[in-house]
């Protein structure tokens, strides 16, 4: 290990790979910003250690915060009581689907990442759950609500929010953009600086965030720090494959997206070596597996093909399709 190679140097490498010549003069300041926002020492030595943070014995329960209700008690408290009573010997981790204020898409159109939806409870309830179970939270990183403070400030041309969202010209050639939804990609919006067309991969209530703007990166580093401090151990990166946009490309799985995942892994691992990143990338198998990187991106990824193949095997009594698929999978990695 090179004792002269520090966390700061690694972050600089990530940022150069993400932004290229876009912010050459400000790259040092940005590196200092993200390291400081995460509460890390820039002179900390880099340790290239890959170890298993989970295995086949890990059982994760996935639930909404209000799946279990009890009169006059906040749902997160009820959920904790319910899990303690019935599942404490069965599960090791709890994935609470978006527990933030939201406007649509069952929580995935976030109004404010820094708050717990008051109808569910508060951060003390989240911390109480994290004290007894490994807690997974969704980092809805590609987009946020069109009614969020950020987007309201974007419309007003104020901070924080100015320049936070992807825009495009309707005359641009967007024919190659990969779309998971059928709604028009661009939404016309009147702003303080004139008419703009904002990019909406999923719905017009979910406006895509502009990671070309380093302020957006800083905002999410701040959010991640808050989640870690509140006990979150597992981070589900929602719709991360769509994160970076580049005209003339499919705008999915771009190199900058992979590099942002690498940067987040570096920062998260140094803040909490036991933290885990899982990418929600519902894409073809080869592209999905690429989010492992070289043991430097996601620790784990969703295997969307497996559940329907298992059902097919059980219903048909024929395991040939499952076996063929398993033969195409690479050996399991550390992580």
Question: What is each of the regions a protein language model found here?
Answer:
Residues 134, 319, 331-334:
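Generic structural signal for secondary-structure transition and capping sites
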Residues 213-235, 322-330:
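An active-site-proximal structural segment forming one wall of the substrate-binding cleft
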Residues 64, 326-335:
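Active-site-proximal substrate-binding groove within the catalytic cores of carbohydrate-active enzymes
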Residues 2-221, 229, 242-313:
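Acidic/aromatic-lined carbohydrate-recognition and catalytic surfaces
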Residues 94, 235-237:
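Hydrophobic residues within beta-strands of alpha/beta enzymes
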């Amino acid at each position: 290990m090179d004792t002269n190679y520090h966390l700061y140097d690694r972050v600089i490498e990530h940022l150069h790979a993400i932004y290229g010549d876009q912010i050459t003069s400000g790259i040092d300041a940005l590196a200092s910003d993200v390291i400081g926002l995460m509460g890390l020492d820039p002179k900390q030595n880099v340790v290239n250690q890959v170890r298993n943070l989970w295995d086949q014995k890990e059982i994760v329960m996935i639930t909404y915060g209000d799946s279990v209700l009890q009169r006059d008690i906040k749902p997160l408290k009820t959920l904790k009581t319910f899990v303690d009573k019935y599942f404490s010997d069965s599960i090791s981790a709890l994935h609470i689907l978006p527990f933030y204020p939201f406007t649509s898409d069952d929580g995935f159109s976030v109004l404010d990442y820094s708050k717990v939806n008051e109808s569910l409870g508060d951060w003390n309830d989240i911390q109480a759950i994290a004290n007894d179970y490994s807690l997974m939270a969704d980092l809805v990183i590609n987009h946020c609500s069109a009614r969020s403070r950020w987007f309201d400030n974007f419309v007003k041309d104020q901070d924080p929010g100015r320049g936070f969202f992807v825009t495009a010209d309707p005359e641009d050639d967007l024919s190659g953009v990969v779309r998971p939804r059928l709604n028009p990609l661009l939404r016309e919006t009147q702003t303080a600086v004139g008419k703009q067309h904002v990019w909406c991969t999923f719905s017009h209530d979910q406006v895509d965030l502009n990671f070309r703007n380093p302020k957006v990166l800083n905002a999410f580093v701040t959010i991640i720090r808050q989640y870690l401090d509140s006990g979150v151990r597992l981070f589900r990166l929602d719709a991360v494959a769509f994160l970076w946009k580049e005209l003339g490309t499919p705008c999915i799985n771009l190199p900058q997206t992979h590099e942002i995942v690498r940067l987040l892994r570096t920062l998260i691992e140094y803040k909490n070596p036991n933290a885990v990143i899982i990418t929600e990338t519902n894409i073809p198998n080869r592209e999905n597996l690429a989010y492992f990187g070289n043991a430097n991106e996601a620790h784990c990824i969703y295997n969307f093909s497996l559940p329907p193949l298992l059902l097919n095997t059980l219903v048909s009594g024929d395991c040939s399709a499952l076996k063929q698929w398993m033969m195409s999978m690479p050996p399991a990695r550390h992580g």
